[in-house]
Amino acid sequence: MRHGDISSSPDTVGVAVVNYKMPRLHSKAEVIDNASKIAEIIVGMKQGLPGMDLVVFPEYSTMGIMYDHDEMMATAASIPGEETAIFSAACRQANTWGVFSLTGERHEAHPHKAPYNTLVLINNLGEIVQRYRKCIPWCPIEGWYPGDRTYVCDGPKGMKISLIICDDGNYPEIWRDCAMKGAELIVRCQGYMYPAKEQQVQMSKSMAWANNCYVAVANAAGFDGVYSYFGHSAIIGFDGRTLGECGEEEMGIQYAQLSVSQIRDARANDQSQNHLFKLLHRGYTGMHASGDGDKGVADCPFEFYRTWVLDAQKAQENVEKITRSTVGVAECPVGNLPHGGKEQTAG
């Protein structure tokens, strides 16, 4: 894995991430116009970065955040649809793969259910090869319908790719799920705003290290009239070290080459920090010395995970005992979310 050049090679996947300026849009026509601008950017980037095999745009980069519910429902997209057709054409023209945000994607029961927050991975032939729906929306603010699974597919040059979105990345479980399915590159598209810049930068680096995987983060930049977005799109090596990172600038771009052979060699041959292997072979050194086989322990030692899988309702009740029993909070109500107390006023 290396950083600083504009090339790629048969062994390296050239990955670019974009600090896309958060748009503020209100209509389908504006969304289509913005999608066309993104398509133009892809073609231009390929000219400047001829080795680019994959370009990643942030969450909300296509549609912005529709703070008006009616606008959100009216602009919700179908997949495939007008937006993905524009992106597919750009990927074919530039001979590159791309990750694009659709906020939202129409629910199967549209308009009776909230839309999904969705990413699509499109290959250089213009084909949609992965569609991921955000599993853990940023409640209480985001009103998206949650997805229910992660995916892994072959990306450029055979690199295994998973997609996750923004707040998903605050939960180690989703990273581990992707990695244990074989993901070598986890793409995290964000529309993350201040004040949580330091925490989000740290999280992506830590998860790359903990899961022996590459991470590509694309985050929004700028101000949309409500939130200020901190950028810092980055490409991180499977050892948790940053290869390239943008600042807070609008439309900043970072680029790095990710070796396919290096990550596979590390996963096969690294020992003390091979976290994926060691998690399912716990204590193999001591057990082998004790005459108890050469595989270590595979059983899950974590009671929480066993409970969650076997009795999700009980797991939910258990977490409410150490947090709260209502989704809303009386001291800081959001929308019409139910809470158990009387709203307090400042002063």
UniProtKB/Swiss-Prot annotation:
SUPFAM superfamilies: Carbon-nitrogen hydrolase. Its EC number is 3.5.1.4. GO terms for molecular function: amidase activity. Signal peptide: none annotated. It comes from the Bacteria. Belongs to the carbon-nitrogen hydrolase superfamily. Aliphatic amidase family. Catalyzes the hydrolysis of short-chain aliphatic amides to their corresponding organic acids with release of ammonia. Also exhibits in vitro acyl transferase activity, transferring the acyl moiety of short-chain amides to hydroxylamine to form hydroxamates. This is Aliphatic amidase. The gene is amiE.
